[in-house]
Amino acid sequence: MEKYKIEIKESAVKEFNSIPKKDLKKIVQKIRSLSDNLRPNGCVKLSGQERYRIRQGDYRILYSIENEILVVYVIKIGHRKEVYR
């Protein structure tokens, strides 16, 4: 299986400033691991959308996969209470 390129949407990058550094480091590691494993253990497909969710502590990472061009788009990162709004 080929490695997928990771692209983080600008709106998701803006969320980095509001996340504590100890959590941010783990979130970045989780995002990097998506290039090797698109659907890791605990990954959930969101209903009604072609998006997936993975957990990192109290934070959620929402992403979509473009198989034709081998890209994973990280769409949103946020606290579990706010990320789905």
List each language-model region with its residue ranges.
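Enriched for short, Lys/Arg-rich terminal
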Residues: 1-25, 56, 64-85
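A short, surface-exposed loop/turn module that caps and links secondary-structure elements
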Residues: 29-54
